[in-house]
């Protein structure tokens, strides 16, 4: 007996579902494959004088070029609270300011997405603006991002630091590293000089070299007389008389032979 046509469709439906889920999983994997991390850079803290404009600098780095999908959001966490309020959004060249009273009509766009800049300006900053500011950037497919945090302090003009804290820290660090390098180089030079003095085994000519008394040059007749004056009873092998050059010139290694050499046989009695 043949099975109804509808039964075959019901039997095949689980296989079709498994196939559909496999296709969806593969598509999701392709979509998430191109997702990469986006890096945001902000100063850790800044000081702004009361009643003046403050610039919140935010830079980012992305492997993809910016476009219409790139967006920037700024949030604020008031000092002493855990509540975060979004007060500014920028996308497709448009500014979307929130209705949060402390920032109403105060915030303006100061960045350039083509230059990876997401900075903003806040006019007439007051003490109520003390807190932490959060910069969040999305640049699909770079959507995995660690937002940047800025700790902002509004202070009186009289106590405003001459330089930002991060600048002072950088200068101090550079000075310390420079001094350390200089001291290390000086110590290395001193150490090498001391070792070279210890390894040197030379002597002072004026102190350790005693003068050598040169022997007067003998004439041939004097040499013959010396031979004749020896006792006649002894026996000795050939005797060679030579004269050395003690002049100390450039060619001191050359041996200068005497003008005459006398051989004598002396026999013992």
Curated annotation (Swiss-Prot):
<feature type="glycosylation site" description="N-linked (GlcNAc...) asparagine">
    <location>
        <position position="50"/>
    </location>
</feature>
<feature type="short sequence motif" description="ITIM motif 2">
    <location>
        <begin position="261"/>
        <end position="266"/>
    </location>
</feature>
<feature type="modified residue" description="Phosphoserine">
    <location>
        <position position="221"/>
    </location>
</feature>
<dbReference type="GO" id="GO:0005886">
    <property type="term" value="C:plasma membrane"/>
</dbReference>
<dbReference type="InterPro" id="IPR013783">
    <property type="entry name" value="Ig-like_fold"/>
</dbReference>
<feature type="modified residue" description="Phosphoserine">
    <location>
        <position position="210"/>
    </location>
</feature>
<comment type="similarity">
    <text>Belongs to the myelin P0 protein family.</text>
</comment>
<dbReference type="InterPro" id="IPR036179">
    <property type="entry name" value="Ig-like_dom_sf"/>
</dbReference>
<feature type="short sequence motif" description="ITIM motif 1">
    <location>
        <begin position="239"/>
        <end position="244"/>
    </location>
</feature>
<feature type="glycosylation site" description="N-linked (GlcNAc...) asparagine">
    <location>
        <position position="64"/>
    </location>
</feature>
<feature type="modified residue" description="Phosphoserine">
    <location>
        <position position="219"/>
    </location>
</feature>
<dbReference type="InterPro" id="IPR007110">
    <property type="entry name" value="Ig-like_dom"/>
</dbReference>
<keyword id="KW-0732">Signal</keyword>
<dbReference type="InterPro" id="IPR000920">
    <property type="entry name" value="Myelin_P0-rel"/>
</dbReference>
<keyword id="KW-0597">Phosphoprotein</keyword>
<protein>
    <recommendedName>
        <fullName>Myelin protein zero-like protein 1</fullName>
    </recommendedName>
</protein>
<feature type="glycosylation site" description="N-linked (GlcNAc...) asparagine">
    <location>
        <position position="130"/>
    </location>
</feature>
<dbReference type="InterPro" id="IPR013106">
    <property type="entry name" value="Ig_V-set"/>
</dbReference>
<feature type="topological domain" description="Extracellular">
    <location>
        <begin position="36"/>
        <end position="162"/>
    </location>
</feature>
<feature type="topological domain" description="Cytoplasmic">
    <location>
        <begin position="184"/>
        <end position="269"/>
    </location>
</feature>
<keyword id="KW-1015">Disulfide bond</keyword>
<keyword id="KW-0812">Transmembrane</keyword>
<keyword id="KW-1133">Transmembrane helix</keyword>
<feature type="region of interest" description="Disordered">
    <location>
        <begin position="202"/>
        <end position="238"/>
    </location>
</feature>
<feature type="transmembrane region" description="Helical">
    <location>
        <begin position="163"/>
        <end position="183"/>
    </location>
</feature>
<feature type="domain" description="Ig-like V-type">
    <location>
        <begin position="36"/>
        <end position="146"/>
    </location>
</feature>
<feature type="disulfide bond">
    <location>
        <begin position="58"/>
        <end position="135"/>
    </location>
</feature>
<keyword id="KW-0325">Glycoprotein</keyword>
<feature type="compositionally biased region" description="Polar residues">
    <location>
        <begin position="203"/>
        <end position="213"/>
    </location>
</feature>
<keyword id="KW-0393">Immunoglobulin domain</keyword>
<comment type="function">
    <text>Cell surface receptor, which is involved in signal transduction processes. Recruits PTPN11/SHP-2 to the cell membrane and is a putative substrate of PTPN11/SHP-2. Is a major receptor for concanavalin-A (ConA) and is involved in cellular signaling induced by ConA, which probably includes Src family tyrosine-protein kinases. May be involved in regulation of integrin-mediated cell motility.</text>
</comment>
<keyword id="KW-0472">Membrane</keyword>
<dbReference type="InterPro" id="IPR003599">
    <property type="entry name" value="Ig_sub"/>
</dbReference>
<feature type="signal peptide">
    <location>
        <begin position="1"/>
        <end position="35"/>
    </location>
</feature>
<feature type="modified residue" description="Phosphoserine">
    <location>
        <position position="260"/>
    </location>
</feature>
<feature type="modified residue" description="Phosphotyrosine">
    <location>
        <position position="241"/>
    </location>
</feature>
<dbReference type="Pfam" id="PF07686">
    <property type="entry name" value="V-set"/>
</dbReference>
<feature type="modified residue" description="Phosphotyrosine">
    <location>
        <position position="263"/>
    </location>
</feature>
<feature type="modified residue" description="Phosphoserine">
    <location>
        <position position="206"/>
    </location>
</feature>
<comment type="subunit">
    <text>Interacts with phosphorylated PTPN11/SHP-2.</text>
</comment>
């Amino acid at each position: 007996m043949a099975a109804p046509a509808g039964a075959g469709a019901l039997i095949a439906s689980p296989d079709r579902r498994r196939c559909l889920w496999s296709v969806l999983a593969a598509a999701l994997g392709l979509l998430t494959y191109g997702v990469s991390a986006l890096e945001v850079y902000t100063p850790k803290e800044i000081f702004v004088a009361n009643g003046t404009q403050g610039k919140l600098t935010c830079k980012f780095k992305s492997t993809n070029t910016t476009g219409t999908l790139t967006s920037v959001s700024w949030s604020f966490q008031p000092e002493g609270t855990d509540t975060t309020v979004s007060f500014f959004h920028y996308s497709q060249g448009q500014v979307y300011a929130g209705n949060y009273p402390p920032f109403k009509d105060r915030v303006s766009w100061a960045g350039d997405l083509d230059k990876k800049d997401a900075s903003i300006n806040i006019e007439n900053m007051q003490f109520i603006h003390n807190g932490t500011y959060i910069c969040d950037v999305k640049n699909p497919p770079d959507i995995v991002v660690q937002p940047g945090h800025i700790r902002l302090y509004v202070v009186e003009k009289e106590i405003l630091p001459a330089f930002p804290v991060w600048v002072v820290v950088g200068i101090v660090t550079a000075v310390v590293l420079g001094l350390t390098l200089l001291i290390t180089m000086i110590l290395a030079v001193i150490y090498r000089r001391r070792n070279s003095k210890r390894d040197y085994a030379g002597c002072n000519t004026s102190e350790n070299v005693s003068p050598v008394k040169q022997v007067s040059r003998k004439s041939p007749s004097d040499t013959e007389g010396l031979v004749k004056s020896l006792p006649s009873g002894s026996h000795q092998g050939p005797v060679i008389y030579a004269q050395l050059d003690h002049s100390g010139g450039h060619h001191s290694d050359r041996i200068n032979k005497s003008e005459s050499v006398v051989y004598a046989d002396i026999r013992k009695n």
